[in-house]
Structures are given as structure tokens and as C-alpha cells.
Curated annotation (Swiss-Prot):
GO CC terms of this entry: cytoplasm; small ribosomal subunit
Family of the protein in this entry: Belongs to the bacterial ribosomal protein bS16 family.
PROSITE patterns: RIBOSOMAL_S16
One function term, GO molecular function aspect: structural constituent of ribosome
InterPro entries assigned to the protein according to its UniProt record, in alphabetical order: Ribosomal_bS16 (IPR000307), Ribosomal_bS16_CS (IPR020592), Ribosomal_bS16_dom_sf (IPR023803)
GO biological process, one term: translation
Disulfide bonding pattern of the chain: none
SUPFAM superfamilies linked: Ribosomal protein S16
Protein name listed in UniProt: Small ribosomal subunit protein bS16
Record Pfam families: Ribosomal_S16
HAMAP family: Ribosomal_bS16 (MF_00385)
Biased composition (Basic and acidic residues): 90-111
Organism: Prochlorococcus marinus (strain MIT 9215)
Gene: rpsP
Compositionally skewed regions (Polar residues) per UniProt: 112-121
Length: 121
């Protein structure tokens, strides 16, 4: 599978990144199939080769999370709302509590039904 990811270069503590297309099993700084752009996190500078990126995306290349946000900012991908981890945990807890309540109500309902059936017999 082809991934669109960041390849690190630059001095120590002054990293810059190239946006590259590479095989998903290759190393982070290994030889890429194609260089598609540039990103400097210190100056927030981003350069994208839009034509090459579009062709790679249509071929089925999967961007990593960071590259996806860069492409969304560049207008190449539609923005997808991704819930934060904290919101997801809170939702799960609410769902668990709701399921527990429904199970308790079902258990109480089945007990009353079985009791009324025995009384009728």
C-alpha cells in the first residue's frame, strides 16, 4: 500500500519535512517513490504539488493523519470532523450507563411477568 507521509530532514532540533509517497513498509527516511511537497513546522510554510498529489490520491494512496490535515488546509481534501479522545471516552461511558439501565429495566420487567404468570396458574 502506498502512503503519503512526512520525511524528516534538516539539522538537529530544526526539522523540516518533505511530503512523500512511499511504500507503507519502508523506513521513514528511506527512498520515496515521489516527493510531493514540503512542510516547515517552525515557519508554518507549506508547498504542495497539487497535480501529483491528486494523481496519487486517485490511485489509492492513504495519507497519514498529519499529511491529511495539511492536505485539508491546502484544499485538496474535504475536512472530516474527527472526535477528540476525551469526547469519545465520555460518549462510551454514557452508552455503557444507558445499556446498564435498559438491562436492569428488562430484568425487572421479566421478573414481574414471570411472577404474574405463576399467580395465574
Amino acid at each position: 500500500m502506498i502512503k503519503l507521509r512526512l520525511k524528516r530532514f534538516g539539522k538537529k532540533k530544526e526539522a523540516s519535512f518533505r511530503i512523500v509517497a512511499c511504500n507503507s513498509t519502508s523506513r521513514r527516511d528511506g527512498r520515496p517513490l515521489q516527493e510531493l511537497g514540503f512542510y516547515n513546522p517552525r515557519t508554518k510554510e507549506t508547498r504542495l504539488d497539487t497535480e501529483a498529489l491528486r494523481t496519487r490520491l486517485t490511485q489509492g494512496a492513504q495519507p497519514t493523519d498529519v499529511v491529511r490535515t495539511l492536505l485539508e488546509k491546502g484544499g485538496l481534501l474535504e475536512k472530516i470532523e474527527r472526535p477528540s479522545i476525551a469526547i469519545g471516552k465520555a460518549k462510551l461511558e454514557k452508552e455503557k450507563k444507558a445499556k446498564a439501565k435498559t438491562k436492569e429495566e428488562e430484568n425487572e420487567g421479566s421478573k414481574t411477568e414471570s411472577g404474574s404468570n405463576e399467580a395465574e396458574s
